[in-house]
């Protein structure tokens, strides 16, 4: 790891975090239900994009942090954009509000939808490539 790698991850993380904040606010202005739609859409769209880009960049999962593109885009931007911790917090908040069933649904739907989105876009990238 070089200082330049650290810079790319940090800059990308800042960009991704700002994107997450901005999209979360926009979704929150229109969606007022109990389901944490903003975090859900952010994580699924991030999984979709990372599936495609990992194929496009030819990511070797044994050394996925090795290039500037991987460090800046995959780890930085998409790592800052998606949020596992917010997903967990949303589920805890739902549980504390007596909506345990919705919390479980949210977690399962998030994981399965994210896996499907990443797989689908990786397959699309392979078809194009």
UniProtKB/Swiss-Prot annotation:
Where do the TM regions start and end? 4-24, 39-59, 65-85, 100-120
Pfam families assigned: CRCB (PF02537)
Where is this protein found?
A: Cell inner membrane
Please report the organism this UniProt entry assigns to the protein: Brucella suis biovar 1 (strain 1330)
Protein name from the UniProt record: Fluoride-specific ion channel FluC 2
Q: Where does Na(+) bind?
A: 79, 82
What does this chain do? Fluoride-specific ion channel. Important for reducing fluoride concentration in the cell, thus reducing its toxicity.
How would you describe this protein's topology in the membrane?
Multi-pass membrane protein
Q: Name one GO biological process term.
A: cellular detoxification of fluoride
Instruction: State the UniProt keywords alphabetically.
Output: Cell inner membrane, Cell membrane, Ion channel, Ion transport, Membrane, Metal-binding, Sodium, Transmembrane, Transmembrane helix, Transport
Q: Name one GO cellular component term.
A: plasma membrane
Lineage of the organism: Bacteria, Pseudomonadati, Pseudomonadota, Alphaproteobacteria, Hyphomicrobiales
For whether the record's keyword set contains Cell inner membrane, the answer is yes
User: What HAMAP family has UniProt attached to this entry?
Assistant: FluC (MF_00454)
